[in-house]
């Protein structure tokens, strides 16, 4: 933001900004600079306004809770401890390059949790004959379902490849990849075939909803890797809700990470629960945001209450390990 803030020329008397998400995630100073420069909002048109004015379709929100396997949980806790030491040991509370690398590594671990693909397959069994489905994967690698300890690193595959394999071979669905690897011409062909709903039932994608790609025929979205950055998940949701002939509503399946299986949280000591709760809090914030405008908000509310109860979120100290 420091370099870009130099573009905010104070000599310019007339200023107008248009943004879907003006607040900068994790950058309160940058957000303050923007508001100070452009001053008060003159017009605000919210997602709620767009839905109520029939500019976007209504939607149903379905949180799907998944957890780490034992090895993954141990890795997550170890990374969280290291991050905490690096940040809390810095008197300026600045995030060092080393801490940033660990944060990225931890985020990838969350995105690639093996249970997510298992849960996706279970959910998708109800829609094996349907079409206009989007599966949103993380740009990350994960161990294949056939992985065995001691095998070489090439056994680790991209999450998208594992999803393609399991939906295509295990459920016999007609699926296609939609990523930055496909050129513009190929993407247009995929979009057309997806719209027609005959040769492609589901697009398995990475980042396509962050790049301005317009696929309004999406009726069901399964989000395996959801950002904690409101800017990103607000944009993704808005694109899923775009109108299309015959599309009355959309379904959004959001895979929520509870580091510890909910039925086992009580068996872990307080320090482990507390370290895990910082991630759960961020997941809850996203769930609240999605549920607020959903047609079935009570479905998410029940899961939110259970997560808060299990992780004692009302009673924990405000101090958290950083995102």
What are the language-model segments listed below?
Residues 12-17, 131-132, 198-202:
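Loop/turn-to-beta-strand initiation segments
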Residues 26-32, 141-158, 262-280:
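Short, flexible/disordered intra-domain loops and linkers
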Residues 42-173:
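Interdomain linker/hinge connecting the two RecA-like lobes of the SF2 helicase core
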Residues 204-206, 211-227, 232-239, 249-255:
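A short beta-strand element within the Helicase C-terminal
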Residues 239-275:
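Conserved segment of the helicase C-terminal RecA-like domain
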